[in-house]
């Protein structure tokens, strides 16, 4: 087990999809084993408003936080409001926007990451990941001894630049990259192609160009190649990685949840009834009518990938 573990995701204190659930629901177990040597790192996207998932604590690592600020990196440090309450570092990566060309240039020179076609939905996560790598490097230099085992775990292409940064600048930090679904695989499935039966026939680089995701696919592919360990969550995605990213995964780590992830008994019944009532009220407001009998509710959540969720028509 490592002495220090960082877990980096765009979904730390920022619920987008299932990765938020994966990390949040294991935090209790990890903090029981590692205490405050387990730190989660996410983007600071709600600076002007209250983030209900984050509780700032100005007493945590005050001097170090101020030293980061002097280096041009703004962070907030506190606790993630989930079971286990791990230390959370939220990074304001906007200070790196003026350096974006240099960051992207270095990714090309060091790893041949092709960022030319990347738009802001690519650039912002890359800057966040890069800043996360800088923060982890600084932490290791200030709080860890040369004998400590330090591991930084990066989820999805949105954070991959962090691991690539550490590989060049902090060789004492072991890097782990997990993909929960490949960029090319999402495109193949979302466009009605036979992902699993024809997987061995696809050229992922060509597909990325066709669907205009070259930059995202490129950094994901290089992350798979150059992190110390490459993980995914199932046999199916492991096969995707083999054919679309060109590297077999080091390990498969199935998603796991705490036993109390779903409410039990009366608490479950009460919360379900309240949620159903709220959904019906919203639907009635949208339609401008009252439903005469109990309606059937079909809902989707997480990423806006309707076809991948089995919906051929969305209105």
Spans of model-derived segments:
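Catalytic cores of nucleotide-sugar-dependent glycosyltransferases that transfer UDP/GDP/TDP-activated
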Residues: 1-315
């Amino acid at each position: 087990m490592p002495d220090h573990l960082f877990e980096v995701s765009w979904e730390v204190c920022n619920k987008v999809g299932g990765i938020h659930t994966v990390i949040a629901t294991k935090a209790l177990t990890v903090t029981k084993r590692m205490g405050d040597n387990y730190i989660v790192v996410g983007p600071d996207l709600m600076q002007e408003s209250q983030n209900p998932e984050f509780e700032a604590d100005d007493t945590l690592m005050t001097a170090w936080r101020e030293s980061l600020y002097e280096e041009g990196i703004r962070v907030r440090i506190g606790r993630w409001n989930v079971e286990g309450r791990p230390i959370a570092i939220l990074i304001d990566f906007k200070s790196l926007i003026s350096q974006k060309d240099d960051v992207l240039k270095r990714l090309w020179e060091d790893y041949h990451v092709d960022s030319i076609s990347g738009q802001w939905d690519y650039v912002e996560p890359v800057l966040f990941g890069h800043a996360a790598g800088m923060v982890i490097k600084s932490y290791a230099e200030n709080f860890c001894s040369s004998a400590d085992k330090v591991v930084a775990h990066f989820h999805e292409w949105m954070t991959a630049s962090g691991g690539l940064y550490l590989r060049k600048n902090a060789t004492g930090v072991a890097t782990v990259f997990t993909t929960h679904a490949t960029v090319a695989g999402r495109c193949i499935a979302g466009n009605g192609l036979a992902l699993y039966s024809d997987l061995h026939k696809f050229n992922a680089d060509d597909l990325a160009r066709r669907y205009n995701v070259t930059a995202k696919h490129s950094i994901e592919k290089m992350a798979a190649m150059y992190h110390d360990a490459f993980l995914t969550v199932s046999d199916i995605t492991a096969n995707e990685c083999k054919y679309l990213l060109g590297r077999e995964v080091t390990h498969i780590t199935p998603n796991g949840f705490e036993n109390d992830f779903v409410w039990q008994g009366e608490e479950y019944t009460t919360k379900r009834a309240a949620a159903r009532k709220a959904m019906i009220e919203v639907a009635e407001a949208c339609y401008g009518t009252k439903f005469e009998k109990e309606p059937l509710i079909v809902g989707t959540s997480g990423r806006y990938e309707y076809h991948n969720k089995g919906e051929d028509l969305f209105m």
